Amino acid sequence: AVGATTTLSNLIVQFLMGMCNGFAIISAQCFGAKDMDRLRRSLGNSLVLGLLAAVVLTIGGLVFLQPILRFLNVPENLLNTATQYVSVIIAGLVVTLLYDVLSATLRAIGDTVTPLIVLAVSVVLNIGGDLLLIVVLHMGVLGAAVATVLSQLIAVVVCAVYLWKKYEILRIRVDDMKLQDAGMLRNMLSSGLSMGFMSSLVNIGTLTLQTSINKLGQNIIIAHTAARKISEIFMIMFSVFGQTMATYCGQNLGAGKIERIRRGILLATGYTCIWCTLNIVTAYTIGDWLVWLVTGSKTPEVIYNATLYLKVDTLFYYVTAVICIVLSLIHISEPTRLRRIS
């Protein structure tokens, strides 16, 4: 059930995450320029705009969930459990949004360690929650979804308390949440939507394939799900570098340090290309073992198709890497039309 619908839930979650990282670019520019009033206002506006987007996606997702799942050709025997899983994930989008805004804001002011630690703790709690709710309480797929949302909720509380106590400059007031600055709103929406669509680009493509994949039987669904999970792990580095460079470039643009931006882009491109090469080597040497590790299946059809997916997919990672780095430059550019086109 999770495998047949994971692309849909990932699409929504990745869009929100990308959008929040786009908002944080404006915060990074304000921080680089040492304009703390605008920094607080950018955080307040990020929360308001993000919450509006999360509420719209939650309502729309819950209302149209059944038609979407049928459009994706989710097998009838998986439809009920798939509905339970995606419904909980969608219902928790506000929690997801709050974590994304807070962690992106911390990165925007140069604190990259805290979001990483909180994320690691959240992952451990998620795994522990899965074991408790699925293995002990026998809640099945519903338990997996609940564990995900609860672990994110804990991450939100930790981030909020840390941010409030550690950074007085980020203690927003009611006035900071008023959408009054037209220029800031325009830049935030342009950057946020651009980053949102970029972050969900792969999932948009995969979603179009899911309708056909779900018709090909259980083994192909398992193979595709396993390959996508491994591929997502491989591609985390591109997303991390893209988000980091967008924040880094925003800070240095605000501070007027253009040469540091050039140097950072070259280094990031080099590092991601090295990562691409390592992924290709991994796919062609131990790809089948990774598939077995993820699925626990020794079915030849599952192993062969998932490994083939990885071997073909990783060859094109260089293109993805360059796109993520270049877009980080475009997202800090002044012409908003260029951001939208990108």
What function would you assign to each model-found segment?
Residues 88, 122, 151-155, 159, ...:
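Transmembrane helical elements of multi-pass membrane transporters/channels
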Residues 27-92, 136-193, 249-316:
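Short alpha-helical transmembrane segments in multi-pass integral membrane proteins
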Residues 1, 69-76, 132-139, 200-229, ...:
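Helix-terminus/linker motif at the lipid-water interface of multi-pass membrane proteins
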Residues 112-116, 144-145, 221, 337:
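Alpha-helical transmembrane segments and their helix-entry boundary regions
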Residues 25, 66-67, 104, 131, ...:
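Transmembrane alpha-helix boundary and packing residues in multipass membrane permease domains
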Residues 61, 130, 159-163, 210, ...:
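Structural signal for membrane-spanning alpha-helices in multi-pass inner-membrane proteins
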Residues 331-341:
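Single conserved hydrophobic/aromatic residue that forms the stacking wall/gate
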Residues 2-59, 96-115, 223-287, 320-333:
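Small-residue-rich hydrophobic transmembrane alpha-helices
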